[in-house]
């Protein structure tokens, strides 16, 4: 089965990601909370992608297919079939921002909207952290302050915001997504805790659930894309 990738300048940077980065990102898209392949995954049914299983650059050589998978999850399944492809990344980003109650200015660049989203996500998560989680986070970003308002300027200055959010995603959200249903109350109007434990789940509490897009996939995926973009950018400076 083909993955129809819509040329997207906001996702072109994925070609510069490492094999490990792309493999981790692809798994977030293709596998559900139990570690099983999502029934709606197109990538895992793609003959080219499957034929390269075990190849040391399976994901790097197929970055466009991975990007297409994100576009696929970002669009309504019926609309995807009608137009033959999913949504552009920016539309997915704006959609996720709205669900996370971020009033994004559409005149802002994609990078700027992502920056606001990462900051808001960190703020919301920090409020839900206990002292142990906070200390673990501070250690991960090598910070020696204890208050968020002191921490944020340091993260911005040293370009560590993406590293901090990436730590939260890898240490909590990704792990939790593998063991719990990420959208436990579909139809009840809320992504109540998103089926997620700990401060990450609590930070996403209250996110509206609608049938159009797979928010259990696109919310962590957009956060991860924002982190990857900054990591790649840092290596190219």
Curated annotation (Swiss-Prot):
Signal sequence range: none
Annotated Pfam families: DUF3944, Ubiq_cyt_C_chap
Transmembrane annotation, as ranges: none
InterPro entries associated with the record: DUF3944 (IPR025217), Ubiq_cyt_c_chap (IPR021150)
Domain of life of the organism encoding this protein: Bacteria
Similarity remark: Belongs to the UPF0174 family.
UniProt name for this protein: UPF0174 protein YaaW
The organism of origin for this protein: Escherichia coli (strain K12)
Name of the encoding gene: yaaW
